[in-house]
Amino acid sequence: LLITSAAFIYAYSDNPYFTITKKDVSVKFPAYFPKPVYAFENNKPTPAGFVLGRMLFYDPILSRDSSTSCASCHQRFAAFAHIDHALSHGINGLIGKRNVPAIQNMIWQSSFMWDGAVNHLEQQPLAPITNPVEMDNELITLMNKLQVISQWFTYLL
């Protein structure tokens, strides 16, 4: 899933470089932009994917106790960074080791996290979801949780 990038692009869907229709998503970049690192042909953007990304980004269901969403730390008004605290706050009020990076222009990045520990955009969301200080969830538990809720089932097929 392109959770973070889909949420970001969907949030700015009125941008003339992104066109979303019922059947298609087209992404056009100005000629002077560098080529994206992310390979869209391996996971083509779809309208349903953008909706799913936005829903997942803002819904706290991704955290173990459904208290913390991606947007809890990646605040839209702050370029999807976190400016309210020096260190990020996660599940149960736990304090992280660093602040969250902004999540803009991610399709041009080859590594993620402050230390570059993740090197693929599709793998990046797994780090905070499974981190015990951030969202503290297990992927199998999360998938089971999402499949029970009918609003998610349509997008997960």
List PLM regions with ranges:
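Periplasmic c-type cytochrome electron-transfer domains
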Residues: 4-157
